[in-house]
Amino acid sequence: MVYSYTEKKRIRKDFGKRPRVLDAPYLLSIQLDSFKKFIEQDPEGHYGLEAAFRSVFPIQSYNGNSELQYVSYRLGEPVFDVKECQIRGVTYSAPLRVKLRLVMYDKDAPAGTVKDIKEQEVYMGEIPLMTDNGTFVINGTERVIVSQLHRSPGVFFDSDKGKTHSSGKVLYNARVIPYRGSWLDFEFDPKDNVFVRIDRRRKLAASVILRALDYTTEQILDMFFDKVSFEVQGKSLVMELVPERLRGETASFDIEANGKVYVEQGRRITARHIRQLGKDGVDQIEVPVEYIVGKISSRDYVNEETGELIAAANQELNLEILALLSQAGHKSIEVLFTNDLDYGPYMSETLRVDSTTDRLSALVEIYRMMRPGEPPTREAAEQLFNSLFFSEDRYDLSAVGRMKFNSSLLREETTGSGILDHSDIIEVMKKLIEIRNGRGEVDDIDHLGNRRIRSVGEMAENQFRVGLVRVERAVKERLSLGDLDAIMPQDLINAKPISAAVKEFFGSSQLSQFMDQNNPLSEVTHKRRISALGPGGLTRERAGFEVRDVHATHYGRLCPIETPEGPNIGLINSLSVYARCNSYGFLETPYRKVVDSKVTDQIDYLSAIEEGQYVIAQANAALETDGSFSDELITARQKGDSGLHPRDHVQYMDVATNQVVSVAASLIPFLEHDDANRALMGANMQRQAVPTLRADKPLVGTGIERSVAVDSGVTAVAKRGGQVQSVDASRIVVKVNEDELVPGEAGIDIYNLTKYTRSNQNTCINQRPTVMPGEPVARGDVLADGPSTDLGELALGQNIRIAFMPWNGYNFEDSILVSERVVQQDRLTTIHIQELSCVARDTKLGSEEITADIPNVGEAALSKLDESGIVYIGAEVKGGDILVGKVTPKGETQLTPEEKLLRAIFGEKASDVKDSSLRVPNSVSGTIIDVQVFTRDGVEKDKRALEIEEMQLKEAKKDITEEFQILEGGLLARVRTLLLSIGYSEEKIASMDRERLFALTLDDESLQNQLEQLAEQYDELKAEFDKKFETKRRKITQGDDLAPGVLKIVKVYLAVKRRIQPGDKMAGRHGNKGVISKICPVEDMPYDEKGQTVEIVLNPLGVPSRMNIGQILETHMGLAAKGIGDKLNEMLKQQQELHKFRNFLQKVYDLGDTRQDVDIAALSDDQVHTLVQNLRDGLPIATPVFDGAPESSIKELLKLGDLPESGQLKMFDGRTGDMFERPVTVGYMYMLKLNHLVDDKMHARSTGSYSLVTQQPLGGKAQFGGQRFGEMEVWALEAYGAAFTLQEMLTVKSDDVNGRTKMYKNIVDGDHRMEPGMPESFNVLLKEIRSLGINIELEDK
């Protein structure tokens, strides 16, 4: 296996046995590809902005004299880059400019004669852009648009499963769902009539819609029924016979032909009888005249002579009618073929309940149903009916809908019109009746072939179209007003509605969510989330059990494990690792093709619909070296059911063992040994892990950590290979390899790192370089680690030495006992950054001012502010300290004589302002790490703002100059190489300055051209950098665009260091969560025979009932991994030769029957040295999901690390020194500190705000509320008989307004008595009873 430069520094031992066929795809592609489709120009106009424009334009005026045509669009450049947008609190977006053409026709000339054409580019608002990491910056905060899983457009056949009607009869229905437009439902009622509903309104007989399509009763019967014809021969009737139709019926007369009786009267007709009739070629039989009674006429029968109607179509026949027919000379009579078994008379019955008779009455009926109360006219009724399903403006099935519609009706072609036609409606009704007749199946709406993904691009396109449609109306009216000669396209278009629609979607849609930025995994997972909620989706309350359940088609598409606990369970899912979206929006998953029982490397992506046709083997099926199956019978899936199949039946095979699960679940080692419920918690809790101060890679991982860290975008990744030229804390410079250069560029890549910035969840984002100057790097190598990454691998927690044993009750009920050493070493210390802002506004009484001159504030409180009244960077502050001094003008009040005197002495200024400074919240303390000042255009900047501006300019200049010098150095190096190649000496070149070098004249023309080209590049580069600096300078110095009425905003960033403490929540990766109960001194912790203490003690009772055995295996494996590291340390101490290290490492990497092939001999001595140094803390191990290390391998590894194979050690009590009576399971587990910190939850209230109505204290920390003393707590006090305590709780401590003010006074006076009064909530109760019309009064006795 080939390792990149970064991977060679620390090679993870992989226990996976199945060969890697397909690497995990780029994890954010679902977001990026979708948005790319939206903004990229599509010449076909099938999707994106192009499709939206084409669907609305051209817009014609009502009189048809002019039209506005769309030509093309382009997106401009964003004004600010992503980082600037985040700092300034603005949206990262680009202006959309559309080229429109206004065409005016000559109304006097023949139609279509053009009078005038005007073309112009029109601004149509801003389109938010996606960052490289798949997020949007909206008003300065990073947001994610979650993809939606919704019901695919098309036609669905379903039944009520017998739940609607009391008889339990199953009622079938069909529903045509368009992408946009009216829904069309057909349904059976308990009497077996077919009804139609439009948009779920009042139902009409289904034949109404057929009549509205201009079909007569005769034509309708013709479409839905087979016919039987009878010949009148004298006194008897001869019926044409189709033997198949007789199956299952009981003969009401002898069936005979040619003198042979086939079935006697009263006997049931069986398949044998039918075969016999067919064999003898019987196609006619004589039937008694009574047989036709009750049959239904298929057409109108008229007396030719008199013109009188004898029998109408759909009329029941009787002997009287038969006699009349015979008299009128009708020798042949056609009736409908129906029976009770599989040819029901449904449509015929429906026609009987239908009150309409012709097209007009049907249209009027539909109009009345859609627009009740409006008087129908013929034109209005026709226009409404046509616009429902037959107009492209109002109705669109979409490409997906048409494809699903056609495949559901078993048609060959997958494409077609977006609107319905007559045959579509008729075929849907026919199929519904077929299903009712027992032929055909209903659809499963939870099948992933019937649910599709709507991603960012598609949702944004829909919103954009909504905005355009709003504009369309205004344009039409404006075009019809006349006087178009002076008008240009931009006068017609108002961009506001478009901007508003787009802004509303990105800012406040249910699917536009504040990004979960706890750690890189939570970012990736949030972008790969699939929600069934949101506009056009389900609601929590209506979603039943079936929708939430795992479906067989989720396999390899949606993760069966990762979903939230609580009301959203099953409605919010996560994409599986390898899943992708196809062009129709259905989820696909990859499979390896099997040809002649041999697995090939050809990979096919199959959607849920396609997958149903194949037999698919699991990824762990045993294979021979040539790729053929080892076993005769293979465990495989077909149509969602697992079973054993002969190997020659298998057509596909899974690509990887972790194909089924999502990214978070595939990060759990030994997942296959955990119960699903706990795995769900484990996957969810990894997303809540806070990045620790020093990231620590997991000793026991699954091998997917690297791709998560790289794809999440928190690390700096090399765009091209090369050599690291220089590294400092904030920048890495790479000189690009010659073969990766674009001709004519300097060949230097510069990576600027992010330092100590705040994430959405107030955690700290900071990047640290992982490379050294001079190191070679390849494309895709990790150059700098971000939060929670270690050498390019995801590192959410810390490897901690743990023991499973009870310890003095401190680990009762999942509590966790932690050693003081963990705190001392800052293993689980995290940095949190808070942003506090202070806004100075223009008020009615005058403008607020940011100043250090604050009334009634002592010198000490101002000690941390500078002269502008803003706290300085580096100051350590605690709750209540002033960060930004601000004064607000006060309204005029009645002055006391003393104040009047002060005014007279000191002038006006003494008391007309009040202190409204920004202070540190009560429970917070920390260090100021940054201050930003934003000043409105036209407002004078204060000294601090100017200082910050100057510093930013200096930094920008330094950055740009350094960047320029690096690139200039690159260019000059190429000039030097050029001159050296034609014989110039090093000294001579060194003695010449840049101007002289570029001014040289060379004899060789091609070299001269090259030199001139380099000189030209230098000039271009200089001009580009000057322009870059000028742009940067303008951005820094110009005033800021602030909200109306805001003069100044000061943002202060406060960093808080949080050590682990009792009350913090921690968890492993297997759903084993707990709260820290005690931080125990190191000397009291249990220790082993070597004197090594454990750092955390967990309760062994947390394992058996939870069935997450994975944690035990991880602990053993962790011990073995650490043992290898300890052995390497021992060898280093003994200063053993390098070849011994090579041999030992080779032995370690070769252990077990695995796919990994590490050749230590191929590494250089330096690389081996780096590898050994990086393995001293322990050997990182990968045990892939469902392909993990077996027990035997763990034992072998423990043996190699000189540890007992049981994984259990003899332990001693730290307090007494006594040995525990049996060996204890000790090892290393990866523990996470979750973002549920006691500091954020701890809260106490003395007095505070009260609710307006009930006068009771508010609830919650944010409102500084009280603790609710509820019903059950009252019972507890009643049980104790604590009457006075209870009285105090229900009155003065809660809502007895007079009592509590009196109590306050009494306490101030040192008198601790209380006088309870009437609780306010009693008055509320009285008022509520009175509002019900019951007069209730309290009588004082």
UniProtKB/Swiss-Prot annotation:
InterPro entries, per the entry: DNA-dir_RNA_pol_bsu_ext_1_sf, DNA-dir_RNA_pol_bsu_external_1, DNA-dir_RNA_pol_su2, DNA-dir_RNAP_su2_dom, DNA-dir_RNAP_su2_hyb_sf, RNA_pol_bsu_bac, RNA_pol_bsu_CS, RNA_pol_bsu_protrusion
First-level EC class: transferase
Record field: catalytic activity: RNA(n) + a ribonucleoside 5'-triphosphate = RNA(n+1) + diphosphate
Molecular functions per Gene Ontology: DNA binding; DNA-directed RNA polymerase activity; ribonucleoside binding
Keywords: DNA-directed RNA polymerase, Nucleotidyltransferase, Transcription, Transferase
PROSITE patterns noted in UniProt: RNA_POL_BETA (PS01166)
Gene3D superfamilies, sorted: 2.40.50.100, 2.40.50.150, 3.90.1100.10, 6.10.140.1670, DNA-directed RNA polymerase, beta subunit, external 1 domain, DNA-directed RNA polymerase, subunit 2, domain 6, RNA polymerase alpha subunit dimerisation domain, RNA polymerase Rpb2, domain 2
EC number: 2.7.7.6
GO BP term, example: DNA-templated transcription
A GO CC annotation given for this chain: DNA-directed RNA polymerase complex
Top-rank taxon, per record: Bacteria
HAMAP family linked to this entry: RNApol_bact_RpoB
Function text: DNA-dependent RNA polymerase catalyzes the transcription of DNA into RNA using the four ribonucleoside triphosphates as substrates.
Assembly notes: The RNAP catalytic core consists of 2 alpha, 1 beta, 1 beta' and 1 omega subunit. When a sigma factor is associated with the core the holoenzyme is formed, which can initiate transcription.
Family per similarity comment: Belongs to the RNA polymerase beta chain family.
Name of protein: DNA-directed RNA polymerase subunit beta
Lineage: Bacteria, Pseudomonadati, Pseudomonadota, Gammaproteobacteria, Vibrionales
Gene: rpoB
